[in-house]
Every structure is written in structure tokens, then in C-alpha cells.
Amino acid sequence: MPAKVSVLITVTGMDQPGVTSALFEVLAQHGVELLNVEQVVIRGRLTLGVLVSCPLDVADGTALRDDVAAAIHGVGLDVAIERSDDLPIIRQPSTHTIFVLGRPITAGAFSAVARGVAALGVNIDFIRGISDYPVTGLELRVSVPPGCVGPLQIALTKVAAEEHVDVAVEDYGLAWRTKRLIVFDVDSTLVQGEVIEMLAARAGAQGQVAAITEAAMRGELDFAESLQRRVATLAGLPATVIDDVAEQLELMPGARTTIRTLRRLGFRCGVVSGGFRRIIEPLARELMLDFVASNELEIVDGILTGRVVGPIVDRPGKAKALRDFASQYGVPMEQTVAVGDGANDIDMLGAAGLGIAFNAKPALREVADASLSHPYLDTVLFLLGVTRGEIEAADAGDCGVRRVEIPAD
């Protein structure tokens, strides 16, 4: 049997129907074996690479080259043909993926990311755009040398702060694609604002409560103590204010899109909140969430007593709730995601397979796997590998695509 060699055929030019067909009709006539095919189209411009195996005399002869060139030139594109014996047939998979999100991503910002990557000997294997709304998003798949993941994360965290973009580094492999359960904090994450402050406004105690809340979110005050102190300011209010506040809740921009898309993907979705069940449950029903963990306000004769009943869902309680829900649905912890914004979310994000800090306080950003700084909850989807195109393609066949104009920053 004659020895065989590898030949790489690279086609470039404006994409059009019939290019692939024209090429493979010629290759079929020469009886070559197909080893690999890769194709990308950027703004209508095609790059098609075909790796084939053929006898040495065919590779070095003129017939294959002339026939391929004639076919490709006939459809108005260019082609290059070269021996490729020294390269692997299938590339080794990337080790990590880097997400860059911004409004906008400037050339300077991306240059800084690329410099940070190159300085550590990290190779960029693949780049693609994943979003043009509500932020610009890019995904880079990279190969990181052993021992360089930590330094890479440190370097890119510095770049993100200096260039005003979000940069996240995640392992790239099977585990990255197997997330199955996600939990959200409620206040300032799933919804805008703090529910306790809305209730306190009804009691004329919003200033006092806001100060306690800020201290707790910064990690300066034990959450259980802060909750009890804040709830105490509500004593004497009629329980009907709870329903009034529930009706006034405004979802975080992108929240419906996020939950709708995750449900399509088969995720179990829920909330774990230091807020109050009677306010959260109507929202959970509306969004068709699978589970809720939150605190319970004590009501006697239709009046708030200023106390909570039952176990307090505090910082350790949030992590426990995540573990309990994961166990209930048979989901390993490495396949869970948690999203939050405050210091009381630290344990929950640390327990999750992927912990995402959303417009978060510094204490949480320091321990999270990824941080998002734009007020659009659907940016969470991009960190899970879902593109804006995929989101809108699914919406187009269901509820329709809707983009709300975003004012310039």
C-alpha cells in the first residue's frame, strides 16, 4: 500500500452557496480520505480548512492541485494547498475560556487582555463574538500552561479594573458544559433595590434601615443581627403593606430573559434570599421558579410584630439552602451556579460550582469565580456559554425578540 501524507486545503473569500459542494466534488474524484474540516464565516467572509490524506504521488502531483484551484476559482474564491504532515489531525482541546464583556470593549481594552495572556505564555486557540446586546461580549478559548491559572486570573483582574470591562476565566471542558441548577439572590440581583428598605419606607424608617443594610452587605455586621434590627422597625405595620410592596417590585433588566433561557436549557432555577417569603413567592410563581428559600415575617392579627419566625436564612443558611436544593434535585455541587451581590452571599457562591458576583460589594468580588459589573442579569448567560444569537433565535420562535434601547453611558 503506498504511503499516505496529509494535505491542508484552505479556501478564503466571500461566502456563497456551493463552495463546499464544489470543493468536495473534486476531492471525491481524486479518492482522498477526509481527516478534518473547520470553517468560520466573519461578516460574510469565509475561511474553510480541509485536511485530507492521500498517496504521496497525488499530494506532490499537479492534478489534484489544478482541479481544486479550478473549482474554487470558478466560484470566485482563493485557495492554498500545502503539505501538513507535522500537525495533529484534531487539535487538543483548550484548557480554559476567557470571557470579556463591556459597554464598549475598546481596542485598547482587548489589547490589554491579549498582552496579559501572552505575557504568561498562554495561547489563544479560538475567539468568537457572543453578544452585541446589552453588552459586547467576546469568548476566548485558551491553552494555559501548568501553574499559570492563578497568575492569569490575577493579571486579568487587574486589566478588568483598569480598562473598565468584565473579564472571567473559567475551566473549559465537560464540567463547564454540565451546569444544571442555578440560584439567585433576590434584592439587587433578581429585582432592583432592597425589599426591606421599601417596607421600611412605609414605617418611616428607611434611613435607619439603609444604614444597617449597607453595613451588613459590606460584611461589617452579622446578617442575622442586622435582619432582626431591620425587621424590628416594621413593628405595627399592617400586613397588607407586604402585598403592596410585592406589586411594586421591578425585575432587574434581563431577568425574564435569563430565567426563560435557563428553563429552556433544562436548568432548575430558584432563589435563596435573606428577604421575605410572602413577597418573593408571587414573583417565583410568575417566573415559574422551582424553589424558594427565604425568611418569614411574623404576623399576628394582621399586624407585623417586628420579628421573624423559623430559621433565619443568613450567610451560612444560604449555602445550606443551595446544598439542600442540589441534593433534592440530584445535582452534584460542581454543576451548580450561584449569583449574588452581598457579603451574605459569600458562602453560597463559594459552595457553588460557579459563583458569580453581580454588581457586588468588594468582599464578594474577591471570592467569586466571576464578577459582572453591568446591571443586566442576562450577562450571566454569557458566562454559561450561551450567545445572544442563541437567546434571540429561541425567543423568535416563542415570545418574539425584543430589544429595549439602552441610553449611552
Swiss-Prot record:
Pathway the protein contributes to: Amino-acid biosynthesis; L-serine biosynthesis; L-serine from 3-phospho-D-glycerate: step 3/3
Cofactor: Mg(2+); Mn(2+)
Top EC class of this enzyme: hydrolase
EC annotation from Swiss-Prot or TrEMBL: 3.1.3.3, 3.1.3.16
Pfam family, one: ACT_6
Sections of the chain in a coiled coil: none
Effect of residue 341 to G: Decreases enzymatic activity by 80%
Places the protein is found: Secreted; Host cytoplasm, Host cytosol
Binding residues annotated for substrate, in chain numbering: 194, 230, 273-274, 318, 344
Main location: secreted
Subunit record text: Homodimer. The dimeric population shifts to a tetramer in the presence of L-serine, which inactivates the enzyme.
Protein name per Swiss-Prot or TrEMBL: Phosphoserine phosphatase SerB2
Phylogenetic lineage: Bacteria, Bacillati, Actinomycetota, Actinomycetes, Mycobacteriales
Gene: serB2
